[in-house]
Design a protein with these regions (language model features):
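Phosphate/dinucleotide-binding and metal-coordinating scaffold of catalytic cores
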Residues: 2-179
Length: 179
């Protein structure tokens, strides 16, 4: 019966081993998991054209590799992998390899095509402060976002561009998008 299930699940919910999601008839129970270096809940913020941030969603990694997404507007859904709205943020191509080279501490390998969803989530959550789109995944990336102006490479004159281009080719240019 429902009361028996609720009674059995209550201590698991309180301990965080099981999470109750949804409301009323749409209520479900999911098994959260922790992604190394990221945790078991990952905030996602939206940055508007003026640079103001607002909550967008919270990602909950689930046992089996799925993700539960609780959007700030009340829409929630289960995704078999990383949600579609993070696809454009996934490091890829030349800039993705540059991103991997710039962050060896991630220990993910030099080719983002070989990264799994947890690897991508870790990269986004720790160093995804300057990627395509208006979303920032994770608290660490959001904190880095606030330091972008200090870290950005600036050209004082046209004569600086060759050196900046060389730095970009070597993967040492700060403040470049990885997309």
């Amino acid at each position: 019966s429902q009361p028996t299930v609720s009674r059995v699940l209550k201590p698991l919910i309180q301990s965080g081993q099981v999470r109750k999601v949804g409301a009323a008839r749409a209520q479900r129970y999911v098994l959260p998991r922790s992604v190394p270096g990221v945790g078991s809940q990952v905030p996602v913020v939206r940055v508007d054209a003026q640079g103001c941030a607002s909550p967008f969603a919270r990602l909950v990694p689930l046992v089996g590799g799925a993700f539960w997404v609780e959007e700030a507007d009340g829409v929630s859904a289960r995704h078999d992998g990383l949600p579609w709205f993070l696809d454009d943020m996934r490091p890829q191509g030349f800039m993705g390899r540059t991103f991997a080279h710039a962050h060896p501490e991630l220990q993910l390998g030099s080719d983002p095509r070989n990264w799994n969803d947890d690897d991508v989530l870790r990269a986004l959550a720790l160093f995804g402060d300057d990627l395509p789109g208006n979303l920032i995944v994770g608290e660490a990336a959001f904190q880095r976002f606030h330091t972008l102006p200090q870290r950005a490479s600036r050209a004082d004159s046209a004569a600086d561009y060759p050196q900046l281009a060389q730095q970009a080719m070597q993967g040492t240019l700060g403040g470049a998008s990885a997309g």
